[in-house]
C-alpha cells in the first residue's frame, strides 16, 4: 500500500499492480496486464529482492535459502523472460532490462551465502540476456549498489561485520542517487548500453574487501 501510494497523484499517474515475482502464474498475469493496458513495454527494472538470516553457513535453513533464491534469482528471471517476450514481439522491436545487482555480486560479506550467490547469478543472467537480446534490440544492464540509505540499509550506520571479524560503521549514499543512476541507464538509446555500473559510498570498505 505504501509503494502503491507513491505515484498515485503523479501526472501521468503511476499504476501499481501487486504480484509475487517468485510465482510464474503471477508474473505472467502481471505482464499480460501491462501489455493489455499500454500496448508495449520499453523498460523493466528488476528490483525485487530479499536477504536471508545472517548465520553460519551450516546453520542456514533450507527454506531460507530457497526463499532468497526464489525471489532474487527466479523472480528476476521470470520477470526478464516475460519482458523479453513482449519486447521481442512488439513494433518497434526492443527494450531495456535493468537488473538490480549488488556490491555482493563482486565480493561477499560474512554469513551471506544465499544473498551473495543470487547476486553473482544475476551477473550471469545479465550478460546472457545482453547476448541473447542483441538480435532483437533488447539491451540488458546491471546496477550494483553499495550502501544505499534505505530502511534496510540503515544497519550500515550502526555497524556491520567485516571480513576480519570486526564491527564497523560504514558510510551510506542517498537512495535518490541510485534512482538517478537507474534513470540514466534507462534514458540511453538502445544502441548504447552500460552493461554494469557500480554506485557506492566513496569511503565504504569495498575495494580490498574479502
Name these PLM-found stretches.
Residues 102:
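Residue(s) in the substrate-gating loop at a strand-loop-helix junction
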Residues 58, 107-113, 170:
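Active-site loop immediately N-terminal to the catalytic Tyr-X3-Lys motif
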Residues 80, 118:
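Active-site helix of classical SDR
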Residues 55-57, 64-66:
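Substrate-binding pocket helix/loop in short-chain dehydrogenase/reductase
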Residues 18-29, 62:
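The beta1-alpha1 cofactor-binding region of Rossmann-like NAD(H)/NADP(H)-dependent oxidoreductases
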Residues 142-143, 161-208:
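C-terminal helical subdomain
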Residues 85, 131-134:
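Alpha-helical segment proximal to the catalytic Tyr-Lys
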